[in-house]
Amino acid sequence: MSGGREIALLGGSFNPPHVAHLMAAWWALATQGVSEVWLLPAFRHPFGKELAPFEDRLEMCRLAARALRGVHVCGAEAELAGDPLVGKTARTLEHLAAKHPTYRFALVVGADILAETAKWYRWDRVQELARIIVVGRQGHPPVPGAPDLPAISSTEIRARLARGEDVRGLVPDRVLRYVEAQRLYRG
């Protein structure tokens, strides 16, 4: 995993993707010396939560990524659909390292995630395979040199959509149009 360009992976359920995800991607591109950021939607939630269909979340990520040059979408977890370790970051990183042997990888995580790494499958392996880039989250201890992302959550966005409330400004316009056209997250 030496040499080559470094790709920052921004993983998540993206259920739906929102502007704080794009802020994290832009910050990583602008300040962390990475060549690209790949949005990496989870094929299924690592802790079993119900998600919108993967193809819908993948398409919403594609639509969101169009807002920023250098941000792309990686559907690698779908390639691992039959693997018993699908959704485990260590397994996804191993898959990507084998598929792209000339790339180096970084993993963008929120400060809130650092408290949960004990629950992760093979966090030690994740750290071997990727440089960890931590972005701040409001309500968590500050991260030196990193901005605090606004407290926007996909959970709150889904709840607002289910109540018929406006979420403009919280999700990219293209994503909102897709959500409305596909009638996602309606109570």
From Swiss-Prot:
Its EC number is 2.7.7.18. GO terms for molecular function: ATP binding; nicotinate-nucleotide adenylyltransferase activity. It catalyses: nicotinate beta-D-ribonucleotide + ATP + H(+) = deamido-NAD(+) + diphosphate. SUPFAM superfamilies: Nucleotidylyl transferase. The keyword Cell inner membrane does not apply. This is Probable nicotinate-nucleotide adenylyltransferase. Disulfide bonds: none annotated. InterPro entries: Cyt_trans-like, NadD/NMNAT, Rossmann-like_a/b/a_fold. The keyword NAD applies. Catalyzes the reversible adenylation of nicotinate mononucleotide (NaMN) to nicotinic acid adenine dinucleotide (NaAD). GO terms for biological process: NAD biosynthetic process. Coiled coil: none annotated. Keywords: ATP-binding, NAD, Nucleotide-binding, Nucleotidyltransferase, Pyridine nucleotide biosynthesis, Transferase. It holds the Pfam family CTP_transf_like. Pathway: Cofactor biosynthesis; NAD(+) biosynthesis; deamido-NAD(+) from nicotinate D-ribonucleotide: step 1/1. NCBIfam families: nicotinate (nicotinamide) nucleotide adenylyltransferase.
